[in-house]
């Protein structure tokens, strides 16, 4: 497999890539880094919202208007929900609680909780759960939260939002709404059953919560939301004909009535060109063609939500549009801009800015409330409006009366500062010297569009062809699916000593940064395409020991919690696994490079780890 991938780096061949027949668990769309990572979780691109890999919505709508008829080909019009009873991230709440098992009926309104303590929510391990306001690290907790509701909610759609680590059972006025079993998740939504909505009353209500902390982190938080009027403007969908995942791009084909539409999401992650690989701009290419021989009037509508630049949808965002050079830009970001202000697992970026851009010729744009934007597009004149900090971005490409037309959008993110490395904030690799702007990156991406797309097509064809020869068709399709995912699971930055740092983010484990046992299974890809990136997977672990910041005689597990690389935060060491991983990867680097220079540079610490393994390797503590 490695040999097949390696030869794909060679001179481009004039080969048309065969379509992948794989039905992927999720389809990669915009792949830049662990934060700007957008996927389709559904078979058809229009069957559900575009999402971040954590499962939270990255709203992105795509609609074709053909001779006045609407066809939605991407995303869905998202549910708009208003806070009714706030979570700890939306406002302050207090409750009675106990960590000792109460008598039966504790979830009912008439239960006497006078002997229980009072605390502020959320409840959890405050050292590693930023929303926890009351320390709870014991095995169990029972909580009774009184909530005042002013509105009559009969007949409304009401949702419970909850975060839990681990098992949680939640009642609303004595009606069980959620029983999670053994799991730990954040910002989940559960629609209240009719019985629970019927039990809601104007005045005082009771939310009763049980949570079991099985191990490590603990957290419990919840609130209620009510659905706004959710009129749908784009009910008719296109018909998806195919989807095809290649290494650099994901291709879709649709029929929109008398017009066929092709879409390609491209992230040019070429590991032999680090400036291009880290350029934080992906392409969305469209191609329309009449399927009945006649000309048709075609407009394409693209709408992105502020969630691309927010951790939580209730955060306040600021949106704007502007032109620079030949590009029209739309931009959104959080109002607060706390750079590197959040760390953790199920967390998205809320500093920096998301951009959507296109050629300013035949483009129009607007920002504002989603329904207003959509209706104005249907009515033929895109119109801006204002919201309370949740403006959406809308971009329309007018293709005119045509039999065939094509073009592209640019989607990107400027994270300003990417990683904190032992107290120092580091810029992204593409702006490592602080002399680049995001607009210059977009301008380069636009100018180089044709050349980059040709290069991507050649790479995709070669990878699929040669991986098929080595491992068969299904193996090749897996290689193509894994390619962008594996690279974009990392962030590349330059250390103060000019070392490359290629830092991974753990997902749905604990959010660690630069974890050795995450590095180990992904390393073959980087050893094949650029051994300097393989070193970038190890440099921080060597530095951590060689600097004396980590003084144990074995390799660390990680260097922090993403994106803060200030030292190991994982609770347990894994000395045998991590030391063995580092030794094997260093040896593999020597084999690929044909010399042991990298090992020589780190010989002292490698010797320390080897001595540890010689003494304890066959009899590990744990």
Regions found by a protein language model. Give the residues of each.
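Short beta-strands within extracellular/lumenal beta-sheet-rich domains
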Residues: 136-150, 189-192, 249-252, 393
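Structural helix-adjacent loops and short alpha-helical linkers that scaffold large soluble proteins
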Residues: 44-47, 71, 293-297, 419, ...
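An acidic-aromatic loop/edge-strand motif
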Residues: 83-103, 108-111, 116-118, 183, ...
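Carboxylate/His-rich catalytic cores and anion/metal-binding grooves
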Residues: 49-81, 229-239, 519-560
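Aromatic-rich carbohydrate-recognition surfaces in CAZymes
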Residues: 432-453, 511-620
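Well-ordered alpha-helical scaffold segments within catalytic/enzyme domains
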Residues: 37-42, 62, 66, 254, ...
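Acidic/polar, glycine-enriched structural segments that form the non-catalytic walls/loops
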Residues: 5-7, 12-28, 37-38, 43, ...
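Aromatic-lined ligand-binding clefts that engage carbohydrates, nucleic acids, or primary amines
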Residues: 116, 139, 147-174, 207-209
């Amino acid at each position: 497999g490695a040999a097949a991938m390696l030869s794909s780096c060679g001179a481009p061949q004039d080969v048309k890539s065969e379509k992948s027949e794989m039905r992927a668990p999720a389809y990669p769309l915009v792949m830049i880094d662990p934060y700007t990572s957008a996927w389709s979780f559904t078979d058809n691109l229009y069957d559900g919202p575009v999402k971040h890999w954590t499962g939270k919505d990255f709203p992105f709508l795509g609609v074709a208007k053909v001779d006045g008829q609407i066809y939605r080909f991407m995303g869905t019009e998202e549910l708009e929900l208003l806070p009714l009873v706030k979570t700890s991230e939306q406002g302050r709440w207090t409750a009675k609680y106990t960590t000792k098992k109460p008598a039966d009926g504790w979830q009912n309104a008439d239960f006497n909780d006078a002997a229980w303590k009072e605390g502020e929510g959320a409840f959890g391990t405050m050292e590693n759960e930023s929303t926890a306001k009351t320390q709870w690290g014991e095995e169990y907790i029972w909580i009774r939260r009184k909530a005042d509701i002013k509105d009559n909610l009969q007949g409304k759609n009401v949702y419970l939002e909850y975060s839990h680590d681990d098992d949680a059972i939640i009642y609303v006025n004595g009606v069980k709404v959620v029983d999670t079993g053994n799991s730990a998740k954040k910002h989940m939504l559960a629609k209240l059953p009719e019985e629970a909505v019927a039990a809601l009353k104007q005045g005082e209500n009771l939310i009763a919560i049980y949570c079991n902390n099985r191990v490590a982190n603990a957290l419990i938080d919840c609130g209620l939301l009510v659905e706004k009027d959710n009129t749908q403007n784009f009910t008719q969908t296109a018909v998806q004909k195919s989807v095809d995942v290649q290494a650099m791009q994901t291709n879709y084909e649709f029929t929109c009535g008398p017009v066929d539409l092709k879409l390609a999401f491209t992230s040019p992650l070429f590991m032999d060109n680090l400036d291009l690989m880290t350029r934080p701009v992906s392409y969305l290419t469209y191609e329309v063609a009449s399927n009945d021989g006649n000309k048709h009037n075609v407009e394409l509508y693209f709408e992105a939500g502020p969630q691309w630049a927010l951790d939580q949808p209730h955060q306040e965002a600021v949106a704007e549009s502007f032109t620079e050079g030949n590009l029209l830009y739309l931009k959104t970001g959080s109002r607060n801009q706390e750079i590197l202000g959040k760390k953790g697992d199920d967390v998205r970026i809320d500093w920096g800015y998301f951009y959507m851009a296109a050629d300013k010729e035949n483009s129009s744009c607007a920002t504002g409330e989603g329904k207003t934007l959509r209706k104005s597009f249907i009515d033929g004149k895109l119109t801006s409006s204002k919201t309370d900090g949740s403006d959406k971005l809308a971009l329309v490409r007018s293709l005119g009366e045509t039999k065939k037309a094509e073009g592209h959008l640019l989607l990107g993110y400027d994270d300003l500062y990417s990683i904190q490395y032992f107290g120092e904030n580091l810029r992204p690799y593409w702006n490592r010297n602080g002399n680049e702007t995001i607009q210059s990156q977009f301008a380069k991406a636009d100018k180089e569009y044709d050349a980059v797309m040709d290069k991507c097509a050649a790479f995709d064809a070669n990878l699929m062809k040669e991986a098929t020869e080595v491992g068969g068709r299904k193996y090749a399709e897996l290689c193509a699916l894994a390619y962008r995912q594996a690279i974009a699971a990392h962030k590349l930055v330059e250390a103060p000593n000019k070392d490359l740092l290629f830092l991974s983010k753990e997902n749905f484990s604990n959010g660690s940064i630069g974890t050795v046992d995450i590095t180990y299974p992904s390393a073959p890809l980087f050893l094949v395409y650029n051994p300097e990136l393989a070193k970038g997977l190890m440099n921080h672990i060597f530095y951590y020991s060689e600097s004396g910041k980590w003084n144990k005689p074995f390799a660390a597990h990680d260097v922090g919690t993403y994106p803060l690389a200030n030292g190991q935060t994982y609770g347990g060491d894994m000395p045998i696994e991590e030391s063995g991983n580092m030794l094997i990867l260093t040896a593999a680097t020597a084999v690929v490079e044909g010399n042991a220079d990298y090992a020589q540079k780190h010989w002292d610490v490698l010797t320390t780890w080897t001595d540890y393994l010689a003494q304890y390797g066959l009899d590990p503590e744990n």
